[in-house]
Each structure stands twice: as C-alpha cells, then as structure tokens.
Regions:
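A conserved structural/catalytic subdomain of Rossmann-like adenosyl-cofactor enzymes
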Residues: 1-197
C-alpha cells in the first residue's frame, strides 16, 4: 500500500530509460508525470502472487501518450483488479480527486479479464476545509471490493474487451453510471398552463 507524490515532475526519467533493473517493462512514464513510474517500480518489486494498492491522481486513468501505452500494456497483461474513485480534497496538499488502483499479478479465475470500478467519490463528510471518509463509506468500499459484483450507481465489473473499445480509458464515470433519471416533462401540459395565465 502506498501514496507516492502526485504527478511528480523530474522524477528521473533519464535514469529509468536505461531500465537496468527491469522496472519499466511497460514503458517509461513521461518526464512531467512520474505516477506510472512509481506504479511500475512497485509492480516490479512484487513476487508472482503479489498485490499492490496505491493512491494515484485521476489523470493516470485516462491521459494518453506514453501513459496510455503503459496503461494499455498493463491491462493486456490483466494486472488491474480494481479502480476506486475517492472524493476530491481528501488528502492534504492535493485538492484534486484521487483514486486507488489495485493491481494483482495472479488474479483468481473469476476475476481474470475483468476490472472492478467503484465510484466512491460521493461518500464523505466535510471536516473543516477537507473531506473525510466515514466508517460507513469505508465499509461500503470494502464490501464492494470483496463482493466483486455490480452495484447500481456505485460499482461495475467490466470486461477487458469493453475497456479496449474505450481505448483503454479507465475513467470511472465511463463505466459506473451515477446520473439521476431526469423527470419527463409533458410539454402539452406545460403549454396548457402557460396559456391559462
């Protein structure tokens, strides 16, 4: 479990390009965003049954270029097990929304070829100028992760094929629909009320 610095600039790309320790097998992260460099370093440190969970900025879920290629390669190797979206303003020094990604080197058969998305960004309480997860928010996240099944407006299990069709974009709202159904408006009724005035 880790919380590396968000979008670290000048993280040491020039050293990583040599890749003498085979830490960056999925590609070298861009010089201006070190997020996936940290993720790959952690991944390379795992044994064959290892699991990692790390806090990342949302940008790594959808940015293109080198990050998109790294994300694609990691998805094709079936490493992503879950992507959990958290509220903005949760961490000191970072007002942007964050996610936790869970990568597993040896997924169980029932999870192979699938990624669980959890949209937990609305579960919090204001605490001064920060947002804070309550016990029930944490319990909901754990329950959704452990059950690894769809939960309306909260969690969705998505096949890798669907992620491929979305250009390997892992933006949570692309998969978990949290929109509220809009009330239908009867135009005839509204026009009738207007004409009565």
């Amino acid at each position: 479990l880790s919380n590396p610095p968000f979008s670290l600039k000048n993280w040491g790309r020039e050293v990583a390009e040599a890749n003498s320790y085979n830490r960056f097998n999925y590609g070298v992260a861009p010089a201006s965003y070190g997020d996936l460099a940290f993720v790959q370093h952690m991944l390379a440190s795992l044994n064959s049954k290892g699991v990692l969970a790390t806090v990342v900025p949302h940008g790594i879920l959808f940015r293109g270029g080198e990050e998109g290629k790294i994300r694609q390669a990691m998805l094709e190797d079936d490493l992503f097990e879950a992507v959990i979206g958290f509220p903005q303003n949760l961490f000191y020094g970072a007002g942007i929304p964050a996610s936790v990604i869970i990568l597993r080197k040896n997924k169980s058969e029932d999870k192979k070829g699938k990624v669980l998305f959890i949209e937990a960004s609305q579960g919090f309480v204001k605490d001064g100028n920060k947002n804070k997860l309550r016990e029930e928010d944490i319990a909901n996240i754990i329950s959704a992760y452990e059950s690894f099944e769809d939960k309306e407006k909260y969690a969705k299990v998505v096949d890798i094929e669907d992620i491929r069709k979305n250009d390997y974009n892992l933006n949570i709202t692309r998969y978990v629909d949290t929109s509220e159904e809009e009330e239908e408006i009867d135009i005839e009724e509204v026009l009738g009320r207007i004409s009565e005035r």
